[in-house]
A protein has these predicted regions:
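Active-site microenvironment of metallo-dependent hydrolases
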Residues: 294-386
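Histidine-centered catalytic micro-motifs
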Residues: 2-13, 165-174
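Glycine-enriched alpha-helix->loop->beta-strand junction motifs that scaffold or abut catalytic
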Residues: 88, 156-165, 197-200, 217-226, ...
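Divalent metal-coordination and catalytic microenvironments
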Residues: 7, 58, 84, 139, ...
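His/Asp/Glu-enriched, well-ordered alpha-helical/loop segment
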Residues: 194-201, 243-327, 341-345
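Alpha-helical scaffold segments that flank or form the walls of functional sites
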Residues: 16-66, 70-90, 119-132, 377-385
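Metal-coordinating catalytic core of metallo-dependent amide/deamination hydrolases
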Residues: 72-208
């Protein structure tokens, strides 16, 4: 089955390999001023590049968490949806948000935060783009250190009224834990419970620093987790307790996260990475190759609450990823599925989304990779020059 990406930031393809030795907060503070120059043309180029890279790695469904809305700039989420439609990939887009700026104790600069009414009104407007198959919409305040308690509460109320899911970053770093304890007097998961988000219509990205009680709370309430192993290692955040979450019965899928904190939009690479970090944490039997592959397919579908994708069964969407197994890296392998996972990243040979070809012979069907890359370089240069 096609891979399912449960956490991404498409716009970040424009800012790869920056703040190379930074932790999360330093990395964000370095890049916030750059992202504040984002416009619709840049976003479209970034989305095309990011979605193309994901498709070539075998990904058929992408959740994108877009939370940067520079003042006066419109059409950013629509640009992502347009790019996904043109390439043929399924997208679950989001109306992310930040309303807690530096002057009020938040991390982002005041120039990148919006007011509550603007956020909620635009979220409701974008909800009309959702359909049952190719486009989904999620309500997604950014993080405890960039949004107010009121926005968390009112976002949940709006999402539930509209029948939409909720998503946020949570428990990614020790610095976030310290921030929540200082500002709210509780841990990130306790804060999530306080604002009414510990529920089955919620999934959270990262969840690296969870206690045993947190794991039990997520499993018991149905909160899903987007595991982003490469990004978490790149920023020195740590390793999520995925084996504990799975043993407790929690929903877990994989995410690339932004390609500014991962540098590769390759979801299949995350399958192997998930296996490696699980074994590094829990030993050689902590996660099998097939269990890791399940995280990237059926696990992701479960996190997104999609029962029509994630596996190849009668009645489900024909989301199919096909890899060749006659290359040098497969020589001597008896278990081809395990070797596909253990030998790492591979360009997909064919990719179908809902039965429609998106990749054929290792090349995009609906666009030229060279043209996407050239336009992306042009827009990245515009962003940095601005």
């Amino acid at each position: 089955p096609g891979l399912v990406n449960t956490h991404h930031h498409l716009y970040q393809t424009l800012t790869r390999a920056r703040a190379q030795e930074a932790d999360l907060f330093t990395w964000l503070k370095t890049l916030y001023p750059v992202w504040a120059r984002l416009d619709e043309e840049m976003e479209y180029a970034a989305a095309r590049a990011g979605l193309a890279e994901l498709a070539l790695s075998g990904c058929t469904t992408v959740f994108d968490h877009h939370y940067v809305f520079p003042r006066g700039v419109t059409g950013l989420v629509e640009a992502e949806i347009r790019a996904a439609h043109e390439l043929g990939v399924r997208i679950v887009a989001s109306r992310g948000s930040m309303d807690l700026g530096e002057s009020d104790g938040g991390l982002p600069p005041d120039s990148l935060v919006e007011d509550l009414d603007t956020i909620l009104a635009d979220t409701e407007r974008l909800a009309a783009f959702a359909n049952d198959d190719r486009v989904g919409i999620v309500v997604a305040p950014c993080s405890p250190f960039s949004v107010t308690t009121r926005l968390m509460e009112e976002s949940a109320e709006l999402a539930r009224r509209l029948g939409l899911q909720l998503h946020t970053h949570l428990a990614e770093t020790r610095e976030e834990d310290a921030y929540c304890r200082e500002l709210f007097g509780c841990t990130p998961v306790e804060y999530l419970e306080r604002v009414g988000w510990v529920a089955e219509d919620v999934w959270c990205a990262h969840c690296v620093h969870l206690s045993d009680a947190d794991v039990a709370a997520f499993a018991g309430s149905g909160v899903g987790v987007a595991h982003c192993p490469t990004s978490n290692l790149r920023l020195g955040a740590g390793v999520a307790p995925v084996r504990d979450l799975l043993d407790a019965g929690a929903r877990v899928g994989l995410g690339v996260d932004g390609t500014a904190s991962n540098e590769r939009g390759d979801l299949f690479a995350e399958v192997k990475q998930a296996l490696l970090v699980a074994r590094g944490r829990g030993g050689g039997e902590a996660l099998t190759a097939r269990a890791a592959l399940r995280l990237g397919t059926r696990g992701g579908a479960e996190v997104l609450r999609r029962d029509d994708i994630g596996s190849l069964e009668p009645g489900k969407r024909a989301d199919v990823a096909i890899w060749r197994t006659d290359g040098l890296e497969f020589g001597g392998a008896e278990d081809l599925v395990a070797n596909l996972v253990l030998s790492g990243s591979h360009r997909v040979d064919r990719l179908l989304v809902g039965g429609d070809e998106v990749v054929r012979g290792g090349a995009l069907v609906h666009a030229r990779e060279e043209e996407i890359a050239a336009e992306h370089r042009k827009q990245a240069a515009r962003l940095w020059k601005a």
